[in-house]
Amino acid sequence: MKIAILSRNQNLYSTKRLKEAGESLGHEVDVIDTLHCYMDISSNRPAVRFKGEALPYYDAIIPRIGASVTFYGTAVVRQFEMMGTFSINESVAISRSRDKLRSMQLLSRKGIGMPRTGFARQPDRIDDLIKNVGGAPVVIKLLEGTQGIGVVLADTQKAAESIIEAFMGLNANILVQEYIKEAGGADIRCLVVGGKVVAAMKRQAAAGEFRSNLHRGGSASLVRLSPQERKTAIDAAKTMGLNMCGVDILRSNNGPVVMEVNSSPGLEGIETATGKDVASMIIEFIVKNAKPNNTKTRGKG
């Protein structure tokens, strides 16, 4: 099988592991810089070009697209879909998951547990926005933030109002969420592949920090999931339409709540914490499911 990994950096842990796993299972795996691709979209034979020539036909692609290049990256994925190539995550699903607000609206519609959340840009009653999610302390997030950037914990009503006013001054879209104190600065990352949780780890925030992202100094350890947590992760992935993703869950007094669904989860932390060969599981899923035009939208949506 011929597989392409769409990644801007072939030396990243996740990219290297996926390439190694694919090759060890006997497949041909290329790493292609998404931003250096360009597309022929006007002819009746759609193509993706790279370094002066049309790329060969690939049986499957694995998009490893960073948040900052979502627009162009998903356009490249869509072009591959139009050519009949199987993508482990479809362009529409990636775009859907990258929009935090749309993701939460979809999860809410499916009745999946979430923290109480408000969305605003220029609210005329900041106090009511805060009150509506249960009052301070609250977590305030920039809608476009990633890896814990643009996420602030406001301990008091006054602090929350000041932070929201500051973000309003930037004309930013913001989410205001209840603070799940009982989680103790920890969350659970569930790695879902093909409708199954194949690995899970607990991420604990560093001392004095409430964000558990490993990029922010958090630590990772093995965790045992409850049946409800496992079901929540699987349901969240299904709602987003993602075959492979990381689902971040907090343990609240009301059961598991989903914080985020990540369409391009890093593999280093979870493989190290669990000792599982997640990269090979991803390749094996592709081998079983990659058939020409085996995407729901075929690049149309």
Curated annotation (Swiss-Prot):
Q: Where along this sequence does the record place binding of Mn(2+) 1?
A: D248, E260
What lineage does the source organism belong to?
Bacteria, Pseudomonadati, Pseudomonadota, Gammaproteobacteria, Alteromonadales
Locate the residues binding Mg(2+) 2.
E260, N262
According to UniProt, the name of this protein is: Probable alpha-L-glutamate ligase 2
Per the record, its GO cellular-component terms are: cytoplasm
One Pfam family named in its UniProt record: Rimk_N
Q: How is the cofactor bound?
A: Binds 2 magnesium or manganese ions per subunit.
Which HAMAP family does the protein's record reference?
RimK (MF_01552)
Please tell me the species this chain comes from: Pseudoalteromonas atlantica (strain T6c / ATCC BAA-1087)
Task: Give yes or no: UniProt keyword Transmembrane.
Answer: no
Which InterPro entries is this protein grouped with? Answer: ATP-grasp, ATP-grasp_RimK-type, ATP_grasp_subdomain_1, RimK, Rimk_N, Rp_bS6_RimK/Lys_biosynth_LsyX
Which positions are tagged coiled coil? none
- Named cofactor requirement(s): Mg(2+); Mn(2+)
Which positions bind Mn(2+) 2? E260, N262
